[in-house]
Amino acid sequence: MGTLHGRLGPRLLMATALVGGLGMVQAAHAQDAPNFEVYGFAQVDFTQDFNRVDPAWDDALRPSKIPTTQGTFGDNGQTSISVKQSRFGVKAQQDIAGKPLFVQFEFDLFGVGGDAGQTTFRLRHAYGQWGPVLAGQTNSVFMDGDIFPNTIEYWGPTGMVFLRNPQIRYTFGSGPGQFAIAVEKPGNDIDPGNIRTVSPELGANIRGDESLPDLTGHYRYQGDWGHVQLAGILRRVGYETVGATDNKPKNTKLGWGVNATSNIKVGAKDVVHLGVVYGEGIASYMNDGGTDMGPEAATGVTLPLPTPVPPGSLRGDVLPLLGLTAYYDHYWNDQWSSSVGWSMTKVDNTDFQEATAYTYGQYASANLLYTPDPRILIGGELLWGERKDFNDNKGDDLRVQVSFKYSFSSKDFR
């Protein structure tokens, strides 16, 4: 218990106190605020990995974290039991000045970034929407979260756009067709590549240029048959060298992308999830794999470069990326269901990225889920992933996950 308490840290304790206080408010004013809800679930995942991935990512299958050199993370085989998917949230809705106000705050325990591998507070949603205006952190306008399949593995298909991002959004229309536009927080992922080898100091000082927000938009049409969505993004992707005169070398490029997605209903409950995304400099918005910009030799320059690197020999270029997702959710009856599908990401690397740079990833899964009650889910899932590097080295991973999920809502106790 002491070890887990230390890993959770003060952020989770403060968050627990916050939602606990909100829960008491909800209990005291249930009749006055019927649209206030406290919700969440406790989930435990048992994962048996037959190969190995980066130990910080044992509890998720990310192709980008699969080693392409045997033994990088030890012998094959790894067991993990995790509660990181467990979730807690609050949401409220009421009319103000004739327009609906919706507010949501939600977190889980899946550490990422500097907290990767830890069971710790991770903010998912923190936003409000009053009428057509939304402000805060939630799903990117470039993303279609509804194509996420009925799977139990946390990270999900590699080839879909998936990013919860701080944004300011405006939505037009309230019928079956809606158009949304937003400015979103920029977050360039720059790969110095082989610059780190020929000039370590230069490579260490390259930083992303995030001087302008990303511009996103989508059109979505919804019907009894499902929905279709077409989304686009324009963004400034660039880099600069901190500590250097005039911050040079530096460069910027236009990043852009198009994301076409759809859910198609089949029969009473079955759903086909489809998605195809293509663009340049959009890896930051992908669920897994790739980088926005990489180094490329200027025209007429041959490799290898001399040391120090001659001025103008290298430039940054945005990387083309293709992502595909196809899944089928089937319901055997009211209690049993399955989801099966495949996803991929393909990156067109620049000529001066390192040989170990990520270039291709695959993700596939199939499951059987039992839901005796809407608040209870028990299921097993077979997963496979593969990574391919710029130098054509490959690595794959095979694993089985068994999960138990128990959900709750304050509405269940009224």
Predicted regions and their residues:
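Outer membrane beta-barrel
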Residues: 31-58, 62-193, 209-227, 263-267, ...
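Outer-membrane beta-barrel proteins
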Residues: 49-53, 114-116, 144-148, 188-193, ...
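Transmembrane beta-strand segments that form the barrel wall of outer-membrane beta-barrel proteins
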Residues: 100-111, 185, 230-236, 337-350, ...
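Transmembrane beta-barrel architecture of outer membranes
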Residues: 123-125, 165-167, 212-216, 253-261, ...
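Detector for outer-membrane/organellar transmembrane beta-barrel domains
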Residues: 223-358, 414
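Outer-membrane beta-barrel "beta-signal"
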Residues: 396-414
